[in-house]
C-alpha cells in the first residue's frame, strides 16, 4: 500500500469467463456478451470513484452498517464482505476495500469475497495481516493495560511528556489528535493505537475520527483521579449519559472478565465462526472419507474443518483450503507452508495454552516496559476481585467463577450448537445457521421510530429487559444460542462484560421449579450443581454482568416465580435479560421492556449462505436455484425464515430430483412436512388448524384481503391462541388498537387457500363441494386464471385429487370463451402490490390483447390448456378430463410447442380437432417499421406559430428517434443475451414413430431472418413432414426460402399459402415457389424489385384462389401477369396496388373469368375504360369487400352498379372524389340497399359534402355497421346529424367512428357534437384529428364537453385528437376523465404530433 495514498485503479476483471461460458451453455443464454458490456460499465464507474486508504471504514462494524440498504438478492452476505475488508459504496452494488481501494460490483457463488480479494489484490496489506488499523466487528475499545509505564507515573504527569510518546502514532489513527489524547492523560503504548492513562492505568484503543478522549476516559474509567481533577462530577456524569450503548458498563467489566480469549479479532475471514472451537470442528468430520491417509484429529488441531466435499478441508480463520492428502502429510506443516499469514497459526506461536493478544509487529517505544500479559491468569483475576471480600462472599465468587466455566463448556459442545430441528433437518451442519446474521430492527417501546441494527450494535446495547420477537422459525433460538456460543468461545469481546450467561428454554420448565434447579437441569448436566443461595448471591453481586437468554417465552403466567420477578422487578436485580418471543406474545411483557428487537425476513443472501455450505459438494444445484429466483422475483420472499431454508435443505438432501425442481410449492410442502413431523403426536389438531387457516386464506384471497382481525379468525374457526397457528400466521400489535394477523407471506396464504379448496372440492359433503364451486367460479375470466389466480391454481394442481380435478379442468377450459369478461380487464391492485412481477405479466397480457386479439386468444388458450393438463395428470384423471379437453381443442389455433405436452403423446388423434398450429421463427435482422423521413407529408409545411403553453402538442422527431433507437438497442442487447432457440420438438407427440396423425394446418411466421442454418433446417424438415397443410408468412427474410429448399421439396405438395413482405426473391427462390403445386394464396408486398419470373408464371398455380400484390412505385403489375391467368376460375381474392398507370383491359378480362370473386382491392392511376371495369365487377355477385384508391375511379359509373352488391360487407372509397351533387345523392340512395354493410369509408368531394346529412340518414338503414369514416366533408350541421342518429339508437354496433380531417367543423360544431353524442355502447375508437394547418385552439367549455362525451362512451379505448391545442388545465380535465373511465387502464389518447421541426413560439 504505497504511502497509504491514492490507489491506482487498473482495469480488473471480476468475471470467470471459462465458468461463464459453461453457464451460458447450461442455461441457453449468451452471458459472455452481457458480462463484457457490464464490465465496461463497471470500469467507467471505478474510474470516477475515490481511491486511497479510508480510515473511516477500518471498523468492520461500520463497514457492516453500510450494507443496510444493500440488495438482498446476492450471493455474498454483508458479513462476508465486511470481514473481507469491503464496505458498500452506495454506487450501484459496488463494494470497496478500505485499505487497497479494490472496487467490486459483482458477487460470485464459487468465490467468496475474501478469495476474490486475494486473487485481485494479493498485495493488500489488510489481507497480509499487517497493522492497518482494522477493527474487528466484535472488538472493544477497552484494552488490557500494560503492567508498568517506564519511569512510573511521575514521568508522565506533564502533558508534554505524554505527547512525546506519540512519536510513532499510527497513520490510520490520525483522526484522533495525539495532543487531545495526551491532554486527557493518555500515553501511547506503542501497540497498534492503544493508549494508557498514566494515572488510573486504563487502556483504550480503536480510535476513530471524531472520538473525544475525555468522553472515552469518563465512560470507561470514571474513578480516575486525574480525570476527576480535570472534570467536574457533573461533566463526567454527562459524558456517561451521552455515551451510546454499554449502559452501566465500565472498563473494569472488560478488564476483569472471566472469559478465556480464544482468538484476537483481527482475522479477515469468519472471525465469529463456531469452528474456533475444536470440538465443533471435530464434529464436521463425521463423514470424513475412511480411506484418507490423514487422521482428522490432526486436521482439527491444525485449525481445519471438513467441507463435506472429497477430502477438502478449510481453515476456520484464514479460509485456506487443502485437499488431496497423502501418506505422511502433516496438516500443521502444510498449513504453515501454504498459509503462513494465518492468524490462527500466529496465535499458536504465541502461547500453547492461554491465548493472549498477538504480539505487536512493531518495536515497543520507551513509554512502556514489555512484561508478560497475565491479567487473565485465574489467580491474579481472583485476587484482584476478592481482595476485600469476606469468607462468605469469597465462596459465592468461587462458585460463580466455577459456574461460568461450566456454562462456557456447555455452550461450546456440539449438542448445544446443533439446531434442534427434529427429524426434518437432522443433517443440518453446525455452522450452517449459527453463522448467519439475522436482520434486526430496534423498536423502543415508548417511541414509534424503528431502526435497523447490526449484530455488534445489538451486543453493545444489551441492558435491562429486552425482547427479540419474530415469527415461528425466524431464527430466535439460533440468535440466542449464537450469543451464548460467542460469549463462551471468547470470540466476542463485546460480550466479555458478562461473567454469567444463562441460556434457558422456557418450554421445558414448570412454574414450581427454582431457578438453580432449571439451570442445573438444562445447562450443567450430570454432576453439575449450584445452590439457590449461591446463585442468588451471584446475581445480586454481579448485577449488570449477568445475562439471561430466555427462549420459547409463552407468557408471564407460566414462568417460575424467580424468572417472573427478574422480568417484572428488574430494577431490584439490574440483570440483563433478552427474551425470545413470538410476535403474538409480546403484549404482556411490553410494560417491562426497555427495547424490543424484531427479527425481519431472512435475507436471500443468507439462504444462499446456508445452501452454499450445505451443498458445497454440488454448487451447480445452488446456481440453478439462484437463476430460477432471478427469473421469478416474486418468489424470492418465500425463504423468509431460517426454518423454511432448513426445510428445503432436508428436501434436497432426501430427494435429489427436488434439486432441479425449484417450485415454491415444493418449499411449502417441505415446511408442512416439518410441521407434521414436529406435531405427529397431535396430527388431528394440526389438520384442523391447517383446515381453518386454509378457510381464512381462501376467503381472504377471493376478497383481496391479506390482513385479518380477531373476528375474521373466529369466523373461519381459527384459534389464535393455539401454538400451531403461530407456524402459519403472524400477529402484529404494535401501534394498533386491535391486533392484525397475516399469513407468513402472500404466497403462503395462496398455498393454504389451495389446500383448502382441494379439500372442499374433494369432500363427500355436498355443502363443502358447493362452497368449493362457489370459490372456483369466482375465477370467471381467462385473465383471472392466467394472472391474478395463476399461482393459486398451480398450488391447487399440486394437491389435486381425482374428485376435484375434472371439475377444475371443465371450468378452466370453458373460460376461454368468456368474451364479456375479456372486455372488462382490470387488475387487482392489492394483489399487484404484493406481486409486482405479476403486474408486469398483466401488462404484457393486456398489451397483447390490445395489439393482437387473435394472438391473445391463442396465448390464453395455450395457457389454460397447459394448466388443465397439469390438473389432469397430477390427479391421474386424464380419461375423465379428456371429453372437456377434446371439446376445447376443436377448431382452435395454438402454438406448435403444445405438441410437446404429454397429452398429444397419449392422444395423437386429438391433433385432428385443431384448426391450425403456429410457429414463429425470428432472426436478428433489425427492421424499422416506421419511416422517419416524413418528407411526403411535411415537406410543404411551415412550422406552426403557437403560444408557449401549447408547445407540448408537438415532439421533435429527433427526440422521438432517439428514444426509438434506445428501444432498438435494448431489444438488440436482449437478443444477444438470449439466442433464438430452435422450435422445440423434443417431447410429447414428436416422440411418436410413426406419427399416426398429421397437423391439419401449420402456420409458419418468419421474421427478420437470413438463411436458415442446418439445425433449423432439420427441425423444419420434421415439422413439415408431419403437416397436412403449410402456410408461410415471411417478413424481411431474404434468402430464407432458398435455405430451406430441402424441406420444401420434401413437403411441396403441402404448401398452400405464401405471404412475403419486405424481402427480395432470388431467381432460384422464384423457381422454387413455382414448384409448389398446391399453392392457393400468394401475397407479395413492399419489395424493391418485381418478381417478374414468378408473376409471368402465375397461371401454373392451378389451385390459386388469392392474389395480393402491393408494390407502390413499381412497374405496372398488371402488364406482367400472363394472359393465362384468367383461366384460374377459382380466384376469390384479387388485390392489386401499384402507383403506375396500367392497362385496364387485361384486368377486365381477368374479373370476367373470376365468378367466385369475394374480395376486390384496386389502387392505381388510370381513368380509361373504367366503365368496362365496373360492368365486369357487376357480374361478381359474391363480392363481400370492395376497396378503391388512387385515380382509377369514375364516380357515376360505380354508383350505377353499387345496388348490385347486396352481399357487400366492406366498402372503402376513402380519398375518392365525388364532385357533383347528383352523383353523390345517387350514392347516398344506393347505400340504403347495402343492408349487410359492416364497414363504410365515405368518399370525399364537394358533392359528398352537400349530401353528407343524407348519407348519415341512409346509414340508419345499415344495422350491421361497425366502422364509419368521414373525411374532409363534414360541417357543423352534418356532424351533429351523426350525434343525433347515435343518440336515437341507430349505431348500436358501431365500434369505430372516424371524423378526422373535417376542417369545416368549427369549435361550436365540435362542442355541440360532444354534448349530443350518446348511446354508442360498443364504440371503441373515436378519431377527431385535424392536420397541422387546421389546428384548433378551444375554450374550456369545449374541453369539458369532450370530457363528458368520453365518459358516456363506456367501451372507448382509443381517442385520436391530433392538432387540438391543449394547455395544462385542458390536459388535466382529459386525464381526470380518463382516470374515471370504465376503460381507464386501456384508454389511450393520441394528441401529440411527431414532427421534423419545432413550432414557432409566439411572444
Swiss-Prot record:
InterPro entries: BIR_rpt (IPR001370), LRR_dom_sf (IPR032675), NACHT_NTPase (IPR007111), Naip (IPR028789), Nlrc4-like_WHD (IPR053882), NLRC4_HD (IPR040535), P-loop_NTPase (IPR027417). ATP binds at residues 473-478. Zn(2+) binds at residues 315, 318, 335, 342. Gene3D superfamilies: Inhibitor Of Apoptosis Protein (2mihbC-IAP-1), Chain A, P-loop containing nucleotide triphosphate hydrolases, Ribonuclease Inhibitor. It comes from the Eukaryota. The keyword Cytoplasm does not apply. One of its GO terms (molecular function) is ATP binding. This is Baculoviral IAP repeat-containing protein 1f. Component of the NLRC4 inflammasome, at least composed of NLRC4, caspase-1 (CASP1) and some NAIP protein. GO terms for cellular component: IPAF inflammasome complex. GO terms for biological process: apoptotic process; cellular response to estrogen stimulus; defense response to bacterium; detection of bacterium; inflammatory response; innate immune response; negative regulation of apoptotic process; pyroptotic inflammatory response. Sensor component of the NLRC4 inflammasome that specifically recognizes and binds flagellin from pathogenic bacteria. Association of pathogenic bacteria proteins drives in turn drive assembly and activation of the NLRC4 inflammasome, promoting caspase-1 activation, cytokine production and macrophage pyroptosis. The NLRC4 inflammasome is activated as part of the innate immune response to a range of intracellular bacteria. The NLRC4 inflammasome senses Gram-negative bacteria such as L.pneumophila and P.aeruginosa, enteric pathogens S.typhimurium (Salmonella) and S.flexneri. PROSITE patterns: BIR_REPEAT_1, BIR_REPEAT_2, NACHT. Residues 464-759 form the NACHT domain. The gene is Naip6. Coiled coil: none annotated. Keywords: Apoptosis, ATP-binding, Immunity, Inflammatory response, Innate immunity, Metal-binding, Nucleotide-binding, Repeat, Zinc. BIR repeats lie at residues 60-127, 159-227, 278-345.
